[in-house]
Structure formats: structure tokens, C-alpha cells
């Protein structure tokens, strides 16, 4: 059975993610408030950002930058 949540990205009830895809408290918030479709949109945007800004996910500063972008993308609409 699909998990239905109120997606804060789309501002409507939507199918939730199957599992917590990001660690920690932020991951829990994403799992509880961001739909599967919204998370897919973020993954697409993340890929674009990594490529455009030539980010290296082994670099801690670059990972922090992506996390900042993720928070803005998912929660500041």
C-alpha cells in the first residue's frame, strides 16, 4: 500500500517515498513532507547543479553546498 503524505513541495496530498533517502533529521523531514515525485524533481535538479558547477561529492564543502540547494529547492517554494 502506498504511503500518502501532505507534500510541502506541491502543497497537496501525494504518494510518499518508500524509504528515508537522506540521513539524519533532515532526511526524516524529507521522508515525512516530500513526495516521491518531488524527490525525483530534486534528483534531476541536483544532477544539473553538480554538472553545471562541477561539484565533487567527495568534497565536504561541495556536499554542504548541495544540501543548501536541496533545502532551498524542497522547502522554500
From Swiss-Prot:
Subunit description: Monomer.
Gene3D superfamilies named in the record: Fe(II) trafficking protein YggX
Organism: Buchnera aphidicola subsp. Acyrthosiphon pisum (strain APS)
InterPro entries, alphabetized: Fe_traffick_prot_YggX, Fe_traffick_prot_YggX_sf
Key words, A-Z: Iron
Sample GO molecular function, one term: iron ion binding
Protein name as catalogued: Probable Fe(2+)-trafficking protein
HAMAP family, per database record: Fe_traffic_YggX
NCBIfam families, A to Z: PRK05408.1 (NF003817)
Family: Belongs to the Fe(2+)-trafficking protein family.
TM spans (from-to): none
GO biological process, one term: cellular response to oxidative stress
One GO CC term, this protein: cytosol
Record's function text: Could be a mediator in iron transactions between iron acquisition and iron-requiring processes, such as synthesis and/or repair of Fe-S clusters in biosynthetic enzymes.
Amino acid at each position: 500500500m502506498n504511503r500518502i503524505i501532505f507534500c510541502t513541495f506541491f502543497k497537496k496530498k501525494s504518494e510518499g517515498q518508500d524509504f528515508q533517502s537522506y540521513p539524519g533529521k533532515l532526511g526524516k523531514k524529507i521522508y515525512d513532507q516530500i513526495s516521491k515525485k518531488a524527490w525525483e524533481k530534486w534528483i534531476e535538479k541536483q544532477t544539473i547543479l553538480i554538472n553545471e558547477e562541477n561539484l565533487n561529492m567527495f568534497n565536504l564543502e561541495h556536499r554542504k553546498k548541495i544540501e543548501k540547494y536541496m533545502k532551498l529547492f524542497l522547502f522554500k517554494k
